[in-house]
């Protein structure tokens, strides 16, 4: 384990204090899990404290942990994962926060802290339905405005709910319920005795 990573973890614990749920060092990376109610405050501290100085947000995404590892996950269903970069200290950090309510996933927007979070948060809202409180323009970014549901959720039907097609009589695009029939695919088992033997 690198001394730099241990030093970063110690700085995080010192600066964030009780805002931290856990800090883990694994596979050459530091991951910190922060409380949802102090997420925005923690982000401000990680950016502004000189011992951390995470000036840049590289990535932010939503995660649905509903079927994570076949029931081995006992935590909240929805999480937000961010990756930060400190140019001053040459550190990278993964930050996780979990939405406290699975039926209405809500976390604070960190767009005022790092403006690069803007479209990332819109994407997480569009695909997972995670609400970012305080985001000034939280609307769909990848799916159509009339789209029903959030397609990256584990409980979203694989075939979708509606399909879009061009209607030549109306001369426009129309939406209709999905016409795909569910079918079960059973693998074919080869029962020949000499199958695969060289001739």
Swiss-Prot record:
EC number, as in UniProt: 7.1.1.-
Catalytic activity: a quinone + NADH + 5 H(+)(in) = a quinol + NAD(+) + 4 H(+)(out)
Keywords, in A-Z order: Cell membrane, Membrane, NAD, Quinone, Translocase, Transport, Ubiquinone
Chief localisation class: membrane
GO molecular function, one term: NADH:ubiquinone reductase (non-electrogenic) activity
Enzyme's top EC category: translocase
Topology within the bilayer: Peripheral membrane protein
Aminoacyl-tRNA synthetase in keyword set: no
Pfam families linked to this entry: Complex1_30kDa
Subcellular location per the Swiss-Prot or TrEMBL entry: Cell membrane
Any one GO CC term of the record: plasma membrane
Subunit description: NDH-1 is composed of 14 different subunits. Subunits NuoB, C, D, E, F, and G constitute the peripheral sector of the complex.
Family affiliation: Belongs to the complex I 30 kDa subunit family.
Function field: NDH-1 shuttles electrons from NADH, via FMN and iron-sulfur (Fe-S) centers, to quinones in the respiratory chain. The immediate electron acceptor for the enzyme in this species is believed to be ubiquinone. Couples the redox reaction to proton translocation (for every two electrons transferred, four hydrogen ions are translocated across the cytoplasmic membrane), and thus conserves the redox energy in a proton gradient.
Protein name: NADH-quinone oxidoreductase subunit C
Species name: Polynucleobacter asymbioticus (strain DSM 18221 / CIP 109841 / QLW-P1DMWA-1) (Polynucleobacter necessarius subsp. asymbioticus)
